[in-house]
Design a protein with these regions (language model features):
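NAD(P)-dependent aldehyde/semialdehyde dehydrogenase
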Residues: 281, 289-409, 420-427, 434-467, ...
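Donor nucleotide-activated moiety binding/catalytic core segment of transferases
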Residues: 132-148, 211-222, 367-383
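Short hydrophobic alpha-helical runs that function as membrane-insertion/retention elements
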Residues: 173-177, 232, 254-255, 412
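Well-ordered, non-membrane alpha-helical segments in soluble/globular domains
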Residues: 38-42, 189, 240, 273-284, ...
């Protein structure tokens, strides 16, 4: 069976299926040829964007709030279609995907949208904010959305929804590359918008298309300053390196890089059975929530210990607690692996044979905990998955910092005092977020900085309109003739 993935271009659904692609797990899907329909995907004229500024920012918010009422699995045929795709193509169970869709309605609440607007400033998104400069010039500044290609991640439905909302709030034009392991959500968003408000300018400002990554024939035509001014890339190293070759004057690159996240278990973690149990429950959620598919999931935890035999035995017992708590996570947020890589499982099994260096708990589709007895994290720490955690005992924070780089997005800490003690140190080592253990997955990237970026601000083009005449701003040509001659 070949699954059909349409192009949705500026409010129109294109179902001329003729190009077949192989999915990650064996199934085929078929799409329209994006080269054939590039003229439909691109704006015919930049003046089409002007319709977005004939509606108010309040109208934009109302549109998104109304959209939230239609984003319902029980009544939305496009979400039901996407759920069938999720069973075949997604990395996680369809139950987790449905739970994520349900939670996305929070992003469409008026309070959330207003908080997002505040990160840029309503006065900049709604109109031209006036600034009176010291030299007499009056500057009026407006933040504009622009035509942007979004190469989103497929590790869940979140990136598609985030792109939809962000694009609407800045009133840009989004061309979304559909990820091969999350084929449904972006299309469902676009088609739901068409059902709700087919002629609305925001509906026509969100297009979705699948093309094979690295298709230089298509990308060289799409990634041109006359077509897009931004590329927002959520891809990995190879993907971003590939996209970067299209960056030139007139095209900016905004990256939300795949990151890794860590935990720090201060000495107080092991002070009592109560603190150990609490930390284990929290850490289990940080590891297993979303099946460890997110950048915010913990993959390595550094445990401060004196290195004694007794302390190592305590950490082994703690590791078992974490493993047991992972098994108790609710099925709507976590499950056993459904597509487990045999190569990964072999790596974990090999470590279990090295008793002097590693203590391994689990290591199968249920997940696992690997305790490094020699103080070094496993050599595939950045690629830990399927709810697999590496606990690394270290004597102090300095011993841990050699592992902390710009690649680390979130650090969860326990107890709370660790955050205040280390936040500056972690920041200068490149960490972008420090939070309480158990809250690593509760990341409000819609409002707070995302991967070190203020996303909405960075996605805008900031335009200044200057009034130099009202206050007679200085200029060489305004000086008296005699003074010029001198």
């Amino acid at each position: 069976m070949k699954y059909q993935i349409p192009i949705v271009a500026r409010g129109a659904v294109i179902e001329d299926y003729e190009v077949t692609h192989k999915g990650r797990y064996g199934a085929d899907f078929i799409c329209p040829d994006p080269n054939k329909y590039l003229s439909k995907i691109l704006l015919l004229s930049r003046r089409e964007l002007e319709s977005l500024y004939q509606i108010s920012l309040d109208d934009v918010v109302d549109y998104l709030v109304e959209f939230g009422k239609h984003w319902n699995m029980d009544t939305n045929p496009h979400l039901q279609w996407a759920s069938e795709l999720a069973k075949v193509f997604n990395d996680v169970s369809v139950g987790l995907v449905k739970h994520a869709w349900s939670g996305q309605k929070n992003a469409l609440r008026r309070e959330t949208l207003e908080a997002m607007i505040d990160t840029v400033g309503r006065e900049h998104l709604e109109g031209w904010k006036r600034y009176d400069r010291a030299n007499g010039r009056i500057s009026h500044i407006h933040a504009f959305g622009v035509p942007t290609a979004h190469v989103i991640a497929g590790n869940g439905p979140g990136p598609a929804m985030m792109t939809f909302v962000r694009n609407a709030l800045i009133r840009g034009y989004a061309i979304v590359k559909i990820p091969s392991n999350e084929l449904g959500t972006a299309v469902a968003l676009a088609r739901t918008a068409i059902d709700m408000a087919p002629d609305h300018p925001l509906t026509k400002a969100f297009s979705t298309v699948y093309w094979r990554g690295g298709d230089s024939g298509f990308e060289s035509k799409l990634y041109h300053p006359r077509n897009v001014e931004r590329i927002v890339a959520w891809g990995g190293f190879a993907s971003v390196t590939h996209i970067a070759k299209y960056v030139r004057p007139g095209i900016d690159l905004v990256t939300f890089d795949p990151k890794i996240s860590r935990s720090i278990l201060g000495a107080g973690t092991f002070a009592s059975e109560t603190t150990m149990r609490e930390a284990a429950i929290r850490l289990a959620d940080d590891v297993g929530n979303g099946n460890q598919n997110g950048c915010t999931n913990c993959r390595v935890a550094y445990a401060i210990t004196d290195g004694s035999s007794a302390s190592i035995e305590k950490i082994k017992r703690f590791g078992q607690m974490v493993f047991d708590e992972i098994q108790k996570l609710p099925p709507e947020i976590s499950s056993e692996a459904i597509h487990m890589d045999p190569g990964f499982q072999s790596k974990v099994a090999a470590l279990s044979m090295l008793d002097d260096d590693f203590h391994v708990i689990g290591g199968d589709k249920r997940g696992g905990v690997i305790i490094s007895l020699g103080g070094d994290q496993v050599d595939f720490a950045d690629d830990l998955k399927y709810r697999t955690l590496n606990i690394v005992p270290v004597k102090d924070y300095d011993a841990m910092l050699r592992f902390i780089t710009r690649d680390v997005q979130t650090v969860g800490v326990y107890p709370e005092s660790v955050r205040d003690e280390l936040r500056t140190t972690l920041a200068v080592h490149g960490v972008q977020r420090i939070t309480s253990l158990g809250y690593m997955r509760e990341y409000n990237a819609a409002i707070d900085p995302h991967d070190g970026n203020e996303a909405l601000r960075k996605m805008c083009t900031w335009v200044v309109a200057e009034d130099c005449m009202t206050n007679y701003a200085p200029a060489l040509w305004r000086k008296p003739t005699a003074e010029k001659a001198a």
